[in-house]
C-alpha cells in the first residue's frame, strides 16, 4: 500500500486513509480513521492499536505515514515533530509492531513458511 500517485491532484488523504484501514484491518488489533481530528484533502489521521496493544495516532499525507501521538485522536507536539516517515502502510506496521513482522513476514519470508522448511 505505497503512496504512488500519478498526479498531485490525485492524492486525497481521507480516501487513502480509509483504503489503508480497509486493507490492513487484519494486521492490527484496532485500526480506524480518526474521528475527532480534522481531515483535509492533503492530511488525514489514523488510529492504530498494534498487536502488542500499543496505541498510535498516525498522520497520512503525500509524504507518507508519520506518528503524531501515542493516544487516539491526538497530535502531541513532542511526537508530531518526529522526522520518521514511512512510505507505505506495511513499512509503518513493520516499524511499530514486531508481532506484525513475525506473523506476516514483512520484508522476509513469513514465519510459517520458514518453520515448514526447517522440518
Curated annotation (Swiss-Prot):
Pfam families: GSKIP_dom (PF05303)
GO MF terms held by the record: kinase regulator activity; protein kinase A binding
Superkingdom classification of source: Eukaryota
Cellular component GO terms, alphabetical: cytoplasm
InterPro entries xref list: GSKIP, GSKIP_dom, GSKIP_dom_sf
SUPFAM superfamilies: Hypothetical protein c14orf129, hspc210
N-terminal signal peptide: none
Family of this protein: Belongs to the GSKIP family.
Annotated protein name in UniProt: Protein GSKIP homolog
Organism (species): Drosophila melanogaster
Amino acid at each position: 500500500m505505497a503512496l504512488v500517485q500519478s498526479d498531485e491532484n490525485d492524492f486525497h488523504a481521507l480516501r487513502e486513509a480509509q483504503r489503508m484501514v480497509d486493507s490492513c484491518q487484519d494486521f492490527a488489533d484496532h485500526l480506524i480513521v480518526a474521528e475527532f481530528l480534522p481531515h483535509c484533502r492533503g492530511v488525514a489521521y489514523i488510529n492504530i492499536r498494534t498487536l502488542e496493544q500499543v496505541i498510535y495516532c498516525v498522520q497520512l499525507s503525500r509524504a507518507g505515514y508519520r506518528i503524531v501521538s501515542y493516544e487516539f485522536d491526538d497530535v502531541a507536539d513532542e511526537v508530531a515533530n518526529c522526522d520518521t516517515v514511512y512510505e507505505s502502510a506495511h513499512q509503518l506496521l513493520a516499524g511499530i509492531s514486531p508481532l506484525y513482522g513475525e506473523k506476516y513476514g514483512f520484508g522476509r519470508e513469513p514465519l510459517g513458511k520458514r518453520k515448514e522448511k526447517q522440518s
